[in-house]
Amino acid sequence: MQLHVRHESEYTYDYPVALGPQTLYLYPRAYPYQRLLTYQLTIDPKPSRIVRNIDVEGNVQQLVYFDHPTRHLCVTAEMELQSDEFNSFDFVLFPFDTQHLPFQYPTPLVDLLQPYLKQVSASDQVRQWAEHIAAGANRQTTAFLMALNQTIREFTYEVREEGAPFPPEQTLTGGKGSCRDYTTLFIAACRSLGIAARFVSGYLAGNPQQEHQLHAWAEVYLPGAGWRGFDPTEGSVVVNRHIFLTSTAKPELAAPISGTYAGQASSTLRSELVFL
């Protein structure tokens, strides 16, 4: 299938400001089953320079520079991708002892995965909850991940367009949250049992509730399978309806646009996301 999306973000300032460098994560990541067909980035006012990099976690990062004051900033990214369906469970966990929890990653991977194993929860509440789910899944790794996904899916979904993810304990206790809250809880539960997990930001097609805003989901690293996506908001594995913009150990680094400006001005943001 082909996915075609346009994402426009417009900042307005009540007085002229000098824009500092702006960091964009609006360029889709490549995956074996998904490839970019067309991409267009439009920025007003016209930047003095755009530098496209690969950041420390392998994401495409675009740094944008300006040399004139402005009262607005409009960034529009339009992209079209070929996204092929595939079997997300077509793998064999190896070494075989990784098929059950708890397990140890092969020694060469441990250092590389440390950022994705760092504990998120400040208390033991999430670990105890994760242990209960794992016991119900006979401590099978894949069965645990699916059960965790479905358990969070049963929470009460809330639209929350701004703000950092809630602490995982808050989402667990309240039984409600946004997609980024669900994802942060999923990650915390995985890491509490020694499964490397990271936060992914991007777009989701085919869900009217989600496709007009940024979406968040998780990826876990499974020996023999690599990084595999799980979407606790959908209660599903990630196949071909998701477009990946950035994946990171720290959710606060996943913003599509970040930067500073100099000037005594307030700003407002208007955002529009459309699948075409």
Predicted regions span which residues?
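Short N-terminal helix-initiation segments at or just after the protein's N-terminus
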Residues: 14-25, 157-167, 215-216
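Flexible, active-site-adjacent loop/turn segments at secondary-structure boundaries
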Residues: 15, 41, 64, 111-115, ...
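Secondary-structure boundary elements
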Residues: 101-177, 185, 251, 261-275
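Short low-complexity stretches enriched in small and charged residues
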Residues: 28-37, 85, 152-153, 173-178, ...
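Residues in well-ordered beta-strands of folded domains
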Residues: 25-27, 42-44, 78, 219, ...
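Intrinsically disordered, low-complexity N-terminal segments that are enriched in acidic
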Residues: 1-90, 94-101
